[in-house]
Amino acid sequence: LTTCGFDFVLASLHNLAGMEDFYFLDYDRQDVNELLTRYFDEILEMVRWDGFDSLAHLTYPYRYITGDKGIPAQLYPDHGEVIDEILSLLVQNHKALELNTSGLRQKLGQTLPPPDVIRRFRQMGGKYVTIGSDAHRWGDIGAGVETGLSLLLQAGFDRFTIYVGREPVLLPIE
């Protein structure tokens, strides 16, 4: 990654080691809590790797577990300790957390991660937050960004982050 001229590098996790993308899993045959425990443990390992700029769509599996399948799953308190450890490492390593708006236009109906995690990140000293629409179609480019910026303000942020040459640039939320 260091040999290429990227503006920023996202870290994301779509599947657990040795498994398919969360999109393809049969949640009727899975222990959801075990999957989520493994997911957050693997995210923690990725954050320890430190070769990225922004952690993308934390809570990605909830798009399918809660959004598509309607299976209730708790972030706090069930996975709060490891989530806090992830957020703490992001703060310590001056990394951004992405507020991904794709869940707003899907059955989930909320951002990834949800607003309470964004607030927690801010409370822990989080400074850098990127915002992305996770567009896989041209019509979704920028979808939900205005709502996302409003959520950032509510969480205590007055700026969001873009990257130029892998260096963070803070822009005011207007």
Label every model-predicted segment.
Residues 1-92:
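Extended substrate/RNA-proximal surfaces in nucleic-acid metabolism proteins
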Residues 17, 70-174:
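Charged catalytic cores and adjacent phosphate/nucleic-acid-binding surfaces used
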